[in-house]
């Protein structure tokens, strides 16, 4: 169900909005309307009455951008995880950018994979033709087919944090959020070096934490990308660079996962449900508990549940 938010503002702000969204204006304007604009995952409609309606998955984020400049803040907009100074510009969907995403963070078995992809604006129609979209709406076979083509089309940087290293870093006090931040930053830095002297118009990270927290996680890193970096939840729907990164990250994860299943000598389930507890218990019986760190993320509750099944 799409969100719908209305704010009350004034003619000056509405004129600023029209200017901001000038590349996204719709030829159609509803009765009593001043303009209608369509940006990724949000439609903005401004009315002569001073009301502005935001509709779509990113309605809260877009509304929050203008709520701060509106002179009538009494129509409060609910605080959104997308409400921050790192929100992408309205025109980002048509820009040449780097997008990054991660896969495997919610799976007990298997590694964490992070990929950064550079998509030139001219490549956007081709990516659409290849079927690039939110990887959650694609099965493993579709992911593989699209990924194999993407590998030859877009520059990318792919990182894999294997389970043993993941557990070692986690034991040293690095939570999953910090590990994700480190990998995203590394993948982005690697890719920017790879595509130099080409400079993207921006970097869009599929948001997994507040941007200020992300940069706190990177405080001790020598190289941190800060220039024109944007964060957005559901980044796949904001720019195809994130959708492409998501597909390549999942492709890498599936390949690693299959190798892990071969190593285990048994099929390993994805996710973190009950079937995972049962498989982990079988794996402990088969290979011994000392081998478990090679296959799983030990801090998940599934570890304790698996051992409980063996009692």
Curated annotation (Swiss-Prot):
GO biological process, one term: mismatch repair
Predominant place of localization: cytoplasm
Cofactor, how bound (note): Manganese or magnesium. Binds 1 divalent metal ion per monomer in the absence of substrate. May bind a second metal ion after substrate binding.
InterPro entries linked to this entry: RNase_HII/HIII, RNase_HII/HIII_dom, RNase_HIII, RNase_HIII_N, RNaseH-like_sf, RNaseH_sf, TBP_dom_sf
Domain of life from the UniProt record: Bacteria
Entry EC no(s): 3.1.26.4
Start and end residues of each RNase H type-2 domain: 95-311
Molecular function terms, GO-annotated: magnesium ion binding; RNA binding; RNA-DNA hybrid ribonuclease activity
Database matches in PANTHER family: RIBONUCLEASE, RIBONUCLEASE H2 SUBUNIT A
Protein name: Ribonuclease HIII
Organism for this UniProt entry: Bacillus thuringiensis subsp. konkukian (strain 97-27)
Taxonomic placement: Bacteria, Bacillati, Bacillota, Bacilli, Bacillales
Gene: rnhC
């Amino acid at each position: 169900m799409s969100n719908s938010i209305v704010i009350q503002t004034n003619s000056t702000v509405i004129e600023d909005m029209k200017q901001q969204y000038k590349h996204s204006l719709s030829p159609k304007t509803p009765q009593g309307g001043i303009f209608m604009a369509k940006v990724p995952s949000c439609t903005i409609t401004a009315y002569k009455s001073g009301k502005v309606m935001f509709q779509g998955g990113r309605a809260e984020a877009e509304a929050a951008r203008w709520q701060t400049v509106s002179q009538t803040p009494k129509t409060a907009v609910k605080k959104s995880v997308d409400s921050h100074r790192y929100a992408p510009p309205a025109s980002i969907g048509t820009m040449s950018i780097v997008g990054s995403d991660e896969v495997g963070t919610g799976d007990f078995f298997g590694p964490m994979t992070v990929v950064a992809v550079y998509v030139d604006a001219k490549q956007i129609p081709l990516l659409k033709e290849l079927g690039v979209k939110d990887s959650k709406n694609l099965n493993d076979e579709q992911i593989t087919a699209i990924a194999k083509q993407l590998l030859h089309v877009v520059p990318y940087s792919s990182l894999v944090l294997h389970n043993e290293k993941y557990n070692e870093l986690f034991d040293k006090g690095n939570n999953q959020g910090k590990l994700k931040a480190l990998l995203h930053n590394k993948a982005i830095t690697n890719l920017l070096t790879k595509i130099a002297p080409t400079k993207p118009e921006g970097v869009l990270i599929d948001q997994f934490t507040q941007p200020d927290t992300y940069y706190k996680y990177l405080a001790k890193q020598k190289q941190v990308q800060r220039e024109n970096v944007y964060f957005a939840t559901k980044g796949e729907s904001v720019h195809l660079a994130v959708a492409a990164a998501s597909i390549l990250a999942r492709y890498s994860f599936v390949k690693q996962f299959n190798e892990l299943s071969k190593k285990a000598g048994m099929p390993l389930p994805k996710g973190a449900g009950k079937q995972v507890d049962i498989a982990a218990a079988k794996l402990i019986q088969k290979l011994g508990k000392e081998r478990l760190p090679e296959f799983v993320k030990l801090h998940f509750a599934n570890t304790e549940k698996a051992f409980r099944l063996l009692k």
